[in-house]
């Protein structure tokens, strides 16, 4: 059996480089040589233990783009019916459908009752902090369009599918929408991008990082607010002055910080919508007044675990917008598999917009 490298989380806050087996794909699956593995804020929560107990040891990375090395028996197309062959570039959704549960077949919702998110590091594995990913039968993957830039798609990793999932949950962005995005990391930047591409009237991005706020403007934000230079009251006043009496018709929480939640409720205007995307790994509570929700007639939706269709939509959208917006520029640094811990530390510190693991390094 042949072996390859992988960044393995062996216990909480401990990541090592291992030599792991390269498995042949199972019938219906695919073996992929990883080209880019996105480093996500969720990975930081996983390593720290905030995301809950994990079945150590696990190969990290749930954002992956790679080239097909070998197809399992019976595989001739991707999950959209597009023919595939060895060497084609693909992008995969990181949870395999079971097709045998209430969530899958009745609700058509994710996560599924029998969802498998991690596997033991020495077993066939789809983690993207590795030289190879072995995609099981049922794990949706899609062939990149010939003109697609892998970096443009990897830059938005699971953030763009998450945003598309969120807008599915709270309703699409319209031409008359006034949007506030809390946080300008990858999820927030993806929220700005989709809102701008959908024709939103006005988009305000809020963040502490001048670099991230500049990137938000390049992706379509019409105004930015520095979190470091303003109080919550000042931010609310700026939003009211910009949007008028109506206020924000849509607020997107993409900050991953608990205090963002009550502030987002305050920023949401009458009959507005508030979608929570970034608080997946933030454990705790925040006080809000239920009366505010009633008086404003507002809606709140949470969203996580995008469906396979959201990964497909994200791939198509990134390919369509890659020449209009500087998507590939979101990738601010590349790391080798051996440097995975360093990449995670820098993401935790907020020092990078979007790092990736590059297995060629």
Swiss-Prot record:
Binding-site positions, Zn(2+) 2: 98, 101, 104
Catalysed reaction equations from the record: (1R,4R,5R)-5-hydroxycamphor + NAD(+) = (1R,4R)-bornane-2,5-dione + NADH + H(+)
GO molecular function, one term: zinc ion binding
GO BP, sorted A to Z: (+)-camphor catabolic process
Leading EC class: oxidoreductase
Binding site for Zn(2+) 1: 40, 62, 170
UniProt superkingdom: Bacteria
Signal peptide region: none
Cofactor note as given: Binds 2 Zn(2+) ions per subunit.
Record keywords: Metal-binding, NAD, Oxidoreductase, Zinc
Listed EC numbers: 1.1.1.327
Induction: By camphor.
Pathway participation: Terpene metabolism; (R)-camphor degradation
Record carries keyword Oxidoreductase: yes
Cofactor: Zn(2+)
Keyword Isomerase attached: no
Pfam families linked: ADH_N, ADH_zinc_N
Family: Belongs to the zinc-containing alcohol dehydrogenase family.
Name of the protein described by the UniProt record: 5-exo-hydroxycamphor dehydrogenase
């Amino acid at each position: 059996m042949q072996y390859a490298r992988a960044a393995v989380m062996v216990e909480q806050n401990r990541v090592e480089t291992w030599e792991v087996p390269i498995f042949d794909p199972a019938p219906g699956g695919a073996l992929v040589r990883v080209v880019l593995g996105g480093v996500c804020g969720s990975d930081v929560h996983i390593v720290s233990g905030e995301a809950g107990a994990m079945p150590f040891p696990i190969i990290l990375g749930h954002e992956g783009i790679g080239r097909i090395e070998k197809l399992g028996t019976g595989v001739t197309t991707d999950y959209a019916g597009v023919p595939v062959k060895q060497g084609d570039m693909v992008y995969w959704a990181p949870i395999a459908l079971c097709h045998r549960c209430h969530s899958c077949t009745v609700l058509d919702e994710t996560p599924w009752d029998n969802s498998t998110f991690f596997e033991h590091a020495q077993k066939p594995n789809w983690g993207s902090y590795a030289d190879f990913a072995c995609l099981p039968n049922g794990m949706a993957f899609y062939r990149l369009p010939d003109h697609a830039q892998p970096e443009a798609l990897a830059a938005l990793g699971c953030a763009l599918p998450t945003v598309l999932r969120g807008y599915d949950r709270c309703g699409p962005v319209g031409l008359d929408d006034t949007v506030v995005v809390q946080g300008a990391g990858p999820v927030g930047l993806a929220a700005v991008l989709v809102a701008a591409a959908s024709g939103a009237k006005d988009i305000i991005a809020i963040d502490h990082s001048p670099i991230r706020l500049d990137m938000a403007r390049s992706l379509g934000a019409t105004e930015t607010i520095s979190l470091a230079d303003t109080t919550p009251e000042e931010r609310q006043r700026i939003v009211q002055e910009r949007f008028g009496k109506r206020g924000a018709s849509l607020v997107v929480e993409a900050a991953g910080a608990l205090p963002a939640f009550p502030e987002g409720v305050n920023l949401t205007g009458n009959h507005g919508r508030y979608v929570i995307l970034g608080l997946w790994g933030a454990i705790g509570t925040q006080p809000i007044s239920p009366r505010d929700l009633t008086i404003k007639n507002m809606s709140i939706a949470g969203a996580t675990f995008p469906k396979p269709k959201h990964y497909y939509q994200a791939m198509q959208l990134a390919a369509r917008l890659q020449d209009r917006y500087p998507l590939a520029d979101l990738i601010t640094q590349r790391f080798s598999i051996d440097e995975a811990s360093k990449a995670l530390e820098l993401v935790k510190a907020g020092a990078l917009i979007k790092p990736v693991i590059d297995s060629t390094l």
